[in-house]
Amino acid sequence: MERKLSQRAGNTFKGFTLVEVLITLAIISLVFSLILISFQRATFFTFGAKKEAERLKSEALLFWELQRSLAGAKKLKINQGKELFLITSGGSLYRGVVKKGFIHKDGWLYLYEFPYPSGSIDFYEEEKLVKLAKLDDFKVFALDSLGKHENYEGLPPFVIVELNSKEFTFKVR
């Protein structure tokens, strides 16, 4: 009876089998999983590129800060290859001649700047330290006709700075 009614109405549709429905769902789930995986990888690589760009930016700013400070240096002191103190005209926080220090401790490179070059050149106040960059390795050497020095006071012709296995040589004055 039902068959005759459906034939009269012109209905020739019999429906989907379970296998067809399962195959369709599997194809749709594969497409969505591919889209999700590609989005996840793109996000991961973008985050990695952003982190690398920030690291390179901080290294470039540090390089520029060191170059400016050493180009205007009037007096320089290096302690154990980990601290660099200067009397320089290349201040970044204050104008004019300043007392400046680059101190590496706890995996961070700190900047200390004081507007008046008075007192001991290697004195700094802990609460006035400014974080410059996170560096695993920071070493400073004075280079003169006698070689490289970890401890130095005066004005050498060159200063060598090692940042995370990269070596930079700066001409002083």
From Swiss-Prot:
Its GO CC terms are:
membrane
- The protein's name is Uncharacterized protein aq_2118
Q: Where in the cell is it found?
A: Membrane
Span of the secretion signal? Answer: none
Q: Which UniProt keywords apply?
A: Membrane, Methylation, Transmembrane, Transmembrane helix
Bilayer-crossing regions: 16-37
Residue ranges of the propeptide: 1-15
Q: What is its main location?
A: membrane
**Pfam families referenced in this protein's UniProt entry, alphabetically:** N_methyl (PF07963)
Key word Acyltransferase present: no
NCBIfam families attached here? IV_pilin_GFxxxE
Q: Which organism is it from?
A: Aquifex aeolicus (strain VF5)
Q: Membrane topology per the record?
A: Single-pass membrane protein
Point out residues bearing the modification N-methylphenylalanine.
F16
Cystine pairings recorded for this chain: none
